[in-house]
Amino acid sequence: MNVLLSPQPPLFQHPHETNRISPSRSLSPFHNMSTSRKRKADEDGDEMSMSPRSSPAASSRQLQRPSKKVRSNELVGRPLTLPRLLETLDPTALRTVLERICERHPDIGQEVVNSAPRPTVAAAHGVLQEYQDKMKAAIPYGETSPDYTYYRVKAPMTALIDALLDFTPQYLPPNETQTTVSLQYMDGATKIIHALPDWEPQQYRHHKENAYDEISKAWALVINEAAKRGGGLSLHTGGWDQTLAKHHEISGGRMGTAMNAMATSVSWMAHGGSSNGQQPGNPSSDQNSILNQLMSGTYGAPVRVGPW
C-alpha cells in the first residue's frame, strides 16, 4: 500500500549548497543584531566625521592661540620709519628737507604757506636775533685791520640785513591790518639796524645806510595808513611819535622819510612842533597839543592876551 508522505527536504544537501544562504531566511537573530550594530557604528562614525567639531581643521583652529607681535630674532638691516627719522632731525635739517620738497613740488609749498600760522612779531625778532648773534660771533678778537674785520663779518651781516628786509613786508599793510603789530615789528627791526657796525671806511657803510633807508620807508607806509584811521590818533596815544623821534636821533638823522610822514599825520595834534624847531613828540610840544586840551577840558577856552 502506498503511503502518502508530505514532501520533506532531502536529508543530505548538495555539497555546493552548504555556503548558499537563502535571501528570505537569516542564519540567526544574533546575526541581524550584530549587523544593525555595525551599521549604526558606521553611521555614527560618518556623523562624527561630518560634524565641524570633530573635523581636523576645527581642532587645529581651537588649539591655536592668538598670535602676538613677536620681534624676529633675525637681525636685518632696514631704514628708520618716518616718525623715528623725524625725531633725529634738528630744526635746521628739518627746514632744509622741507624746503627741498617744496621746491620740487610747488603745490606742497603753497599748501604749507596756507596751513602755517602767521608768524608773530616775537618769532620774527627771534629769528633776526639769531642772525645778529652769528654776526657778532664772526667779529675777530684783538686788534685787526678794518678790511680784515669787514670781510670776516660781511657774510653774516649781509644775511642779517637780507632776512630783515624779507620779514618787513609781512608786517606792512595791506598784508598786516593792525597798526600796532606793524609798529612793534619795525621798532625791534630798527633797534637791530642800530646795532650794525659803523665801519670806519666810508665805502663799507652802505649796508647800514641802505637798511635805514628801507626801514624808514616802511615806517612811513604804516604811519600814512594809520593816519587814515582816526586821523593818526593811535600814533600819538601809543607814543609812537616819540619812539620814532628817538630812532631818528640814534640813526644820526637817517629816518627823515618816516619823520616827515609822522609830522604830517600828527601835525593837528602838536601845534608848534615844527614852527619852534622842536620835533614832534617832545614833552614841551605835548602841552599845546589838541589832544591834551581835549583831555583836560580846556579846548576852546578863551586865550588870555597881555601881561595879566
Swiss-Prot record:
GO terms, biological process: nuclear protein quality control by the ubiquitin-proteasome system; proteasome localization; protein transport
Keywords: Cytoplasm, Nucleus, Protein transport, Transport
InterPro entries from the UniProt entry: Cut8/Sts1_fam (IPR013868), Cut8/Sts1_sf (IPR038422)
Region (Disordered): 1-75, 269-290
Subcellular location: Cytoplasm; Nucleus
Residue ranges, compositional bias (Polar residues): 20-35, 276-290
Record-level Gene Ontology MF annotations: proteasome binding
Domain of life: Eukaryota
Compositional bias of kind Low complexity: 48-61
GO cellular component: a single term: nuclear membrane
UniProt record similarity statement: Belongs to the cut8/STS1 family.
Subunit-structure text: Binds the proteasome.
Protein role: Involved in ubiquitin-mediated protein degradation. Regulatory factor in the ubiquitin/proteasome pathway that controls the turnover of proteasome substrates. Targets proteasomes to the nucleus and facilitates the degradation of nuclear proteins.
Protein name: Tethering factor for nuclear proteasome STS1
Organism: Colletotrichum graminicola (strain M1.001 / M2 / FGSC 10212) (Maize anthracnose fungus)
High-level lineage: Eukaryota, Fungi, Dikarya, Ascomycota, Pezizomycotina
Gene: STS1
